[in-house]
Amino acid sequence: VVHTAVELVGHDYLSVFGDTLRLVSSESVLSATPQIIVTTCGVDKADSLIALLGIQADSLTTHPESFYLAAKDVDGAMRMFVIGGDARGTAYGLMELSRLMGVSPWEWWADSPIAPRKRWVVDAFEKICYPAVRYRGIFLNDEDFALVPWANETYDKGTRRGELGPKTYARIFELLLRLRANTCWPAMHECTVPFFFVEGNREMAEKYGIYMGASHCEPMARNTNGEWRVSGVGEYDYVNNSEEVKRFWRERVEEVAETPIIYTLGMRGVHDGRMNGAKTIDEQRTVLTQVLADQRAMLAELVDSHLVHIPQVFIPYKEVLDIYNSGLEVPDDITLMWCDDNYGYIRHLPDSVERLRSGGHGLYYHVSYWGRPHDYLWLPSTHPALMTTELLRAYDADNRN
């Protein structure tokens, strides 16, 4: 992701100044010429540079994805420094350079104009930045009438019908990187070829430093709605067909075990409906308890025996919130992702006991909605004032994971 960010900064520099940046990978960190020096904690020469600048190393390494950015006089010459606590932090620091040059993160998607410059004057400064929320991203949902036809008919002609491929996802992931987002739930309706079925998509996510996840009805990184009819056998039913369901999940986990994934745990129906095979709340709670245990055993076997190292999320959406409130016990290291009511009003915020969970809390929030009892899409999106109010409520209630 650092190399990707360097490429983007080079592109932005050319757009602003009409000139190219000269990239040098050098053992000699400092020279007499003007420089933008970029490194990451743990890389050769980084420690000596951190000491030279008088930075406390733990101020960068304590927080994931942090970065140090400065314009500073060192040895009689003004230089700019970008030092990341990790690779994503370095990339975000580089993207901040683009913002300082006057390049909007929306320069491509919104045709935000880039004002040309002959020179760039920056006063001396230094700052350390890190995210307030650990995982930040978007869900590409309800793509049937917008994203998919736009990609197929306009931006990426020649792809098979319903395919969102690496060319389209590269533009989406670039925007996320520029906005310092690190997470994406890919498009998953029946009209769309599932994300992992398209060659190059997974590699594109890794190129831009994006954790791939999946929605409330897509456990274990499988697009159940699009993939069960292709790879599943029998009914998607954990009561009566659990071995086939586990085989279905296992195939994907084996495939992506080395990929940055946030695993959604639990189970609903094939697409945004109640689970099959369990009718009452008590029955559903019993099934979900077993599902969670089996999923975590699979992750421990195939990904990492130390489950705390694997990002996992449980999403009490719609009827699943009733199951949770009936007494479902979710392992402590799993993030609980709370939800709005589909219209922008959060249904539940963690109480004082829930806030003690080591897995922390997150939020699944609708900017638009396609479903019962009433759709609101495109221009009539959730009002920004309501979004501000509700997102701040969530943040203040420790929904920060």
Placement of each model-derived feature along the sequence:
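Gly/Pro-rich turn-and-neighbor structural signature
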Residues: 23-25, 114-121, 189, 196-197, ...
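The substrate-binding groove and active-site-proximal loops of carbohydrate-active enzymes
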Residues: 81-84, 141-166, 182-192, 227-245, ...
